[in-house]
Structures are given as structure tokens and as C-alpha cells.
Design a protein with these regions (language model features):
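Hydrophobic alpha-helical segments at protein termini of multi-pass membrane proteins
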Residues: 1-258
Length: 258
């Protein structure tokens, strides 16, 4: 396989997504600390809850379910979307509720906001930030000629496999690399909104607000999987933005209710 050049616009998209993934959480942390008077601890509690509930517990359940269900689940886009949405909502919102109910002290609006910044922020850094760093490193290797030199030292089969694995960096539309950053902005706003909903559910002892948090999380994850199979990444992000807008309005309404 011939190694192409990674367009400058693609690298710009990678850098944009990288900056968003780290600058947004840091900016929100500073804002919540300086402007809202939040404590720092809820940010790191949010980071920890995401790690434990998603990367450890949810991932373990996925391994078991996929092993048992096999293609019966992964072979159906609808079933896979429903399953993915349910698991994401169950683990993340349950973790959010437990953290806010028992760990975040005092449980007030500034600390709920700070928790959401941590939960959504660490997700951005780990999922998009790390991938962006890898993409940028690969692009630099390709454009500098380092990759071609390394491939020349491999046998034909390994060289072809390596080039194929990296080919997306020069064959993917440049705009697509900006999508990761846009997606993270939407996701962080969603996590802030869901954190406020869960906070209000605890403050007001309102099951409705908690159920809304579960529902919005399920809907956005399920729709993202479904639409990814039939539509462009920008259609997926548009729908995600609309659903997130609904979550923002619901959180605002919950704050206005007594």
C-alpha cells in the first residue's frame, strides 16, 4: 500500500480535538472554582466515578454479555444501540447519583457543576484527547517520511498491515477530525446538565429529575449508535446537540422548580 500525506487541514482537526479535550475540562474547573466557589474534590470524584463505573465495571459487563450473546447482539444495530444506551445510562447515572448522594459534600449547585466537569472532562481527555495525540504522532511520522523508512525495514506483509492500520489518517475527510472535538463539547455540556438534574433530584427528593437524567443519557447514546450506521458523523453530532439542548432546558427548568 502506498503511504499518502496527511493534509494540513486534517492535522488542524486533530489539534483542535486535542485542545478541546484538555482545555475545556481545565477551563471549567477554573470557572467552577473561581467564579462559582466550588470545591476541587467533586471534579476528581467525577473523574474517579467515570473510571470505575465505565472503564472498569461497565467494561467488565460488556465482556461477559458480548461473550454470551455474540453476534445476536452485535449483529443487530437496533439491539446493540438499545443495549449500549441502557448500559451507559445505568452505570454512569447510577454512579453519578451515588457520588452526589454520599461523596460530594456539600451537595450544592457549584459542586454539582464541578462534578459534571470532572465526569465529562476525564471522558474527553481519555477518549478523545489520547486518540488525538496518537493521530498527531502518526501524522507527523507519515509526513516526515519516518513511517515510510520504518515500513521499508519490514517484510511485505507486516508493512502492508501497518500501512493499512494507519491509512485512515490520510484517507479520512479532514472535517471528520474536527468532529471529535465537537462531540466532546456536546458531551461535556450533557454531563453538566445531567449532573444538575441528579443534584436537583437529591435536593428536592424528586424521582422525576433522576429519571430524566437516565432517559436523556439513554436516548443520546442509543441514537448516536443508530444514526452512525446510516448517516454522516455531522448528522450524528447535530442530533446529539439537539438532545443535549433538551437536557440543558430540562436542567434549567429543574433549577427553577421549588
Amino acid at each position: 500500500m502506498t503511504v499518502g500525506m496527511v493534509p494540513g487541514a486534517s492535522i488542524a482537526g486533530m489539534v483542535f480535538s486535542l485542545v478541546v479535550s484538555f482545555a475545556l475540562p481545565i477551563g471549567l474547573f477554573v470557572y467552577a472554582k473561581k467564579k462559582l466557589g466550588a470545591k476541587a474534590a467533586p471534579f476528581f470524584i467525577g473523574c474517579g466515578v467515570f473510571f470505575v463505573m465505565v472503564l472498569v465495571l461497565e467494561a467488565a459487563v460488556h465482556r461477559i454479555v458480548f461473550q454470551l450473546a455474540g453476534e445476536a447482539l452485535t449483529g443487530s444495530v437496533i439491539l446493540y444501540a438499545v443495549y449500549g444506551g441502557l448500559m451507559a445510562a445505568l452505570f454512569e447515572e447510577t454512579g453519578r447519583y451515588i457520588a452526589m448522594r454520599f461523596l460530594v459534600k456539600p451537595m450544592d449547585f457549584p459542586n454539582a457543576f464541578m462534578y459534571g466537569a470532572g465526569h465529562g472532562g476525564v471522558e474527553a481527555m481519555l477518549l478523545c484527547g489520547v486518540a488525538s495525540i496518537s493521530n498527531i504522532a502518526g501524522a507527523v511520522m507519515i509526513n516526515s517520511g519516518t513511517l515510510s523508512a520504518q515500513l521499508a525495514a519490514l517484510d511485505a506483509e507486516k508493512a502492508a498491515d501497518t500501512a493499512a492500520a494507519l491509512s485512515a489518517l490520510w484517507t479520512t475527510s479532514s472535517l471528520t477530525f474536527f468532529a471529535g472535538g465537537v462531540e466532546r463539547i456536546i458531551a461535556v455540556v450533557l454531563h453538566l446538565s445531567l449532573s444538575i438534574l441528579v443534584f436537583q433530584s437529591i435536593r428536592k427528593k424528586s424521582q422525576k429529575d433522576l429519571l430524566n437524567a437516565y432517559l436523556f443519557h439513554f436516548v443520546i447514546d442509543s441514537l448516536s449508535v443508530l444514526l452512525s450506521a446510516v448517516a454522516s458523523v455531522w448528522v450524528v453530532e447535530l442530533v446529539a446537540a439537539l438532545v443535549t439542548g433538551g437536557a440543558v432546558l430540562m436542567a434549567k427548568y429543574a433549577c427553577m422548580e421549588e
